[in-house]
Structures are given as C-alpha cells and as structure tokens.
Amino acid sequence: MLKMKTGLQRAFLAVIVAVGTLWRMTLVAQDAASLYKAKCAACHGADGKGDTPVGKKLGLRDFSSPEVQKMSDAELTTIIADGKEKMPSYKKSLKPEQIKDLTAYIRDLGSKK
C-alpha cells in the first residue's frame, strides 16, 4: 500500500511539473507574440513577410527567405538587440530573455511559408 501511495505521489508530481512547463511555454509564446506585435509588426508585418507600407519602403526581407533562414539565432538576437541600418536597437527597452523569445518567435514565423 505504501509503495502504491508513493508511486501515485510521484505520478501526480510529474503531472504537475508537466502542466507547469506547458503553462510557461504558452505564456512565453503569448508574451513573444505580444512583443512582436508591439515592436516589430508595424514594419515586418503580422506574418513576418515585410510587406507593410513601411516594410516595402525599407526593402525588408521576408522572414521565410533563404537569407533570413540561414542566419543563426545568435545573429538574429544581435540584430534585435543592436539594430541594423534603419532598425532600432532594443537592448535598452527589452530584457535579454525577451529578445531571445522574439528570436524564437521570428524563427517560427519564418518557418511558415
């Protein structure tokens, strides 16, 4: 009986940990989507195609383009943090973790053709 109780406790704990992890991942994805909408979508578009009026004027690349997709996460993170050409720097207004989350979100947008 004691072994069964201990096994159930372990299973319950595993479920709690799994649910907590999924919840955190969902929050991170929602936060990244909100950040992208607030900081990036005006130029890059909601879908990362760069086809907004501003994006067209600046000649922004589609996130699914080979040029963007071949960039490493470190390169994308650096561009978000430091800016590039007409793109502003976000290292003073975003936390490193937020920049990392944006990189993952942009990578995900780019994988959707």
Regions found by a protein language model. Name each.
Residues A33-G59, K84-K86, D108-K113:
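Periplasmic/extracellular electron-transfer cofactor-ligation site
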Residues I79-I80, K91-K113:
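C-terminal capping alpha-helices of c-type cytochrome domains
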Residues M1-V28, D108-K113:
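Post-cleavage N-terminal segment of exported redox proteins
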Residues V19-L35, D51, P66:
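Electrostatic cytochrome c docking/interface patches
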Residues K49-T78:
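Gly/Gly-Pro-rich "capping" loops immediately C-terminal to redox-active cysteine motifs
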Residues Q30, K70, S93-E97:
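Soluble non-cytosolic domains of exported or imported proteins
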Residues S64, P88-K91:
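Residue-level detector of conserved, well-ordered beta-strand and adjacent loop positions
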